[in-house]
Amino acid sequence: MNIILNILNQFLKKGRSIVILKKIVRRFSKNNFDKNQYKNWLDSNKSSLDKFLKKINHRLFIETKKESLKINDYANNRLKNIKVKLGGGANDMLLYFFVRYFKPKVVLETGVAAGFSSLSILKALKKNKYGKLYSSDFPYFRIKNPENYIGILVDKKKFPNWELKIEGDEVNIPKLISNINHIDIFHYDSDKTYKGKINVYNLIKKKISNKSILIFDDVQDDKFFYEICQSSNLQYKIFKFKSKYIGVLGKIKSNEI
C-alpha cells in the first residue's frame, strides 16, 4: 500500500507522470536476444580491470585502490542506518582512475542513486583541481520522499563543480549539455532498458567524439553495447564487476584498449 501511495505522490508532481509511464512501458517491453550467446561474447572479450589499470599507470592504480577503500568505508557507514534500498554502487575504481588519468573538463553521468559514482568522480576531479560533473537522475518513485536520497553520499558544499538534475534523462540531458561543447567522459547507469540506452545515446552523440571515453554499466541486460561496438570505429573493453559487466568504449593507448 505504501508503495502505491509513493508512486501516486510522484505521479502527481509536475512532469513526473510522463517519465514514470515511459519507464513502466519500457520495463515490460520484450527484449529479444539470445542471452546465452551474448554472455559468451562478453566472457570471451572480458579483461581483468586490475591488470588493465596497473598496465596503464601502476602508481595511479595504488592511489585508486586507497581511495576506493575510503569511499566504500564512508559509504557503508553513511548508508547503514538508511532503511530503503538505493541500488548498488558503480565501479568506483574504474571511474576514479579514468577521471584522474584523463583529467577531463566535462564528465556526464546518468544514474546517481545514493551517489557512489558521483562521489568517486568528484573526488578525482578535486584531486585534478580541474573539471566539472554533470549528473542526471530520476527519483525512485516507489519510496517515500525519494528526492532526499539522491546523491546522499555527496557533501554538496565540498563540490561546487557538481550540477545535478532529477527530472529524468530525456529532460535533464538536453539541459545539462546545452552549454557543453564536448563530453570527455560519459558514464551510463540509469534506465536499464535497451530503448532507454538508445534514447540517451542519441541525445549525447553530437557532443562526443573519438576522443571521448564512454562507460556503460550492466551491458549484459541487452545487446545495446554489442551493437554500438559493431557500428562504431571505437575500440572497446569489457570488465566483469560482481555479477554484472561494464563496457568501455574509447581509445586510451593503441596497445591498451
Could you tell me what each predicted segment is?
Residues 13-14, 54-59, 66-71, 156, ...:
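Polar helix-capping/helix-linker motif
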Residues 37-50, 65-75, 111, 148-155, ...:
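Short charge-dense sequence patches
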Residues 81-86, 92-257:
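S-adenosylmethionine/decaboxylated-SAM
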